[in-house]
């Protein structure tokens, strides 16, 4: 960890705990800051706040009192989930208290170079793929960021011999000023989190912060299959490297069933351990990063052929009575569902879908639904999805929850069929997270297995 004195004896406010706030509080205390943590959860229900108090860090819980900002704070470290129109954030900015992100804090202390991955879909899979390939090539890659390991915590332990492979959400990137990864990846961009950002343009602007400080000595890996993303190459100082499943590009690409990097054949697409065209995209982005890091084709091919996926992201769960189950609970939007379906023969697929109603009519999903064996629909958006199913000529059944849907799907299935949970909707109408939704699918599979 770099020794920096910027925060020594300075009063710093941590707004919102969760994993990243807790990690930031400990790091700033270690750097000599006078830390105050403010979290809305009551103290008696807040084990993280209790632990920090025991470590000598001041904690204020239960509300966000504006008068707290009357203290002379040097800066505020904001939880990524707290919006910039939050009264505490607005008041802090009015008082000229600078807002720092936890990701920026990690960058300031990290001795290790950073590879940053962002985008609307595919971030976690691509981040994990990259780390696996680098580690297989004897480069010490450490996962960090939105993938579940607070960046500021990982950065403290990292040395100059390590590499931080960091998944970055738009929430984390918004507000970064000094953050400068050596390699950055943008997997794709579709309208997401508009309730947070307000518009697609503002969402793109948040994602674009990833390259804000990059120079021509840094590399920006871009999806050339999306004209929007491809065009960003004209707007960066970084050196662009492309990936594409449709055309030969200056970077990684798919041609005649093989994955290439700059005319050098790396591996066959058929060797990839995960189905779906979107996973070819993820693999190509990984290949681009791996080749920039000097990893051999043999290591890349071997690692990607054995890569079995990430939990809740087109995760192969198992096979029961020759029926195969896939858990793609992370499919919280239409594009994710489209990409999941692209990996299968629709005539064998029973799709479990539905969730939080955000007003989508799902018309753009209709062509991808054509030919499905059946759909099992649930959640607030079920009626809208039924209209899409009708347009696609697909029959459907209702289910009260994922567990019931899984059982119904299995009753409808024949040997050789695929039961795919890919909701195309957020989970919050029925479940606290996509993880809990996916866990119910896994538990339902285990229950069916126990009955078999």
From Swiss-Prot:
Its EC number is 6.3.2.9. It catalyses: UDP-N-acetyl-alpha-D-muramoyl-L-alanine + D-glutamate + ATP = UDP-N-acetyl-alpha-D-muramoyl-L-alanyl-D-glutamate + ADP + phosphate + H(+). It is found in: Cytoplasm. ATP binds at residues 119-125. Keywords: ATP-binding, Cell cycle, Cell division, Cell shape, Cell wall biogenesis/degradation, Cytoplasm, Ligase, Nucleotide-binding, Peptidoglycan synthesis. GO terms for molecular function: ATP binding; UDP-N-acetylmuramoylalanine-D-glutamate ligase activity. InterPro entries: Mur-like_cat_sf, Mur_ligase_C, Mur_ligase_C_dom_sf, Mur_ligase_cen, MurD. Pathway: Cell wall biogenesis; peptidoglycan biosynthesis. Its main location: cytoplasm. GO terms for cellular component: cytoplasm. One of its GO terms (biological process) is regulation of cell shape. Pfam families: Mur_ligase_C (PF02875), Mur_ligase_M (PF08245), MurD-like_N (PF21799). NCBIfam families: murD (TIGR01087). Cell wall formation. Catalyzes the addition of glutamate to the nucleotide precursor UDP-N-acetylmuramoyl-L-alanine (UMA). Belongs to the MurCDEF family. This is UDP-N-acetylmuramoylalanine--D-glutamate ligase. The lineage of its organism: Bacteria, Bacillati, Bacillota, Bacilli, Lactobacillales. The gene is murD.
């Amino acid at each position: 960890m770099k020794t920096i004195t910027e925060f020594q004896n300075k009063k710093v406010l941590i707004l919102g705990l969760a994993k990243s706030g807790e990690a930031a509080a400990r790091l700033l205390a270690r750097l000599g800051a006078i830390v105050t943590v403010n979290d809305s959860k009551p103290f008696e229900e807040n084990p993280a706040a209790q632990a920090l108090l025991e470590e000598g860090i001041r904690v204020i819980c239960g509300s966000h009192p504006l008068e707290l900002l009357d203290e002379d704070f040097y800066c505020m470290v904001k939880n990524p989930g707290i919006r910039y129109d939050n009264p505490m954030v607005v008041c802090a900015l009015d008082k000229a208290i600078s807002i720092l992100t936890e990701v920026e804090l990690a960058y300031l202390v990290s001795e290790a170079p950073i590879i940053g991955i962002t985008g609307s879909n595919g971030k976690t899979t691509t981040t994990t793929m990259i780390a696996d390939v680098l580690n297989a090539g004897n480069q010490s890659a450490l996962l960090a960021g939105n993938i579940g390991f607070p960046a500021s915590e990982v950065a403290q332990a990292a040395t100059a011999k390590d590499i931080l492979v960091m998944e970055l959400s738009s929430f984390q990137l918004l507000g970064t000023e000094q953050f400068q990864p050596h390699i950055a990846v943008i997997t794709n961009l579709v309208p997401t989190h508009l309730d947070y950002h307000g518009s697609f343009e503002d969402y793109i602007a948040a994602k674009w912060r990833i390259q804000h400080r990059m120079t021509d000595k840094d590399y920006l890996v871009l999806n050339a299959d999306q004209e929007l993303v491809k065009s960003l190459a004209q707007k960066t100082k970084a050196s662009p490297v492309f990936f594409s499943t449709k055309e030969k590009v200056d970077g990684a690409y798919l041609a005649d069933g093989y994955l290439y990097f700059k005319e050098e054949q790396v591996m066959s697409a058929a060797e990839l351990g995960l189905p779906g065209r979107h996973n070819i995209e993820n693999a190509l982005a990984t290949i681009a990063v791996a080749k920039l890091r000097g990893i051999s084709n043999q290591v890349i091919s071997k690692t990607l052929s054995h890569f079995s996926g990430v939990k809740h992201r087109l995760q192969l769960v198992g096979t029961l009575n020759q029926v195969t189950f896939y858990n793609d609970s992370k499919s919280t939007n239409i594009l994710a569902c489209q990409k999941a379906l692209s990996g299968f023969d629709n005539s064998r697929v029973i799709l479990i879908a539905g969730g939080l109603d955000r007003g989508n009519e799902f018309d753009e999903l209709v062509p991808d639904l054509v030919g499905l064996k059946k759909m099992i629909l649930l959640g607030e958006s079920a009626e809208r999805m039924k209209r899409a199913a009708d347009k696609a000529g697909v029959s459907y059944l209702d289910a009260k929850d994922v567990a019931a849907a899984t059982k119904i799907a299995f009753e409808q299935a024949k040997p050789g069929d695929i039961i795919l949970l890919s909701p195309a909707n957020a989970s919050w109408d029925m479940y606290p997270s996509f993880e809990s939704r996916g866990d119910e699918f896994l538990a339902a599979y285990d229950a069916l297995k126990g009955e078999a």
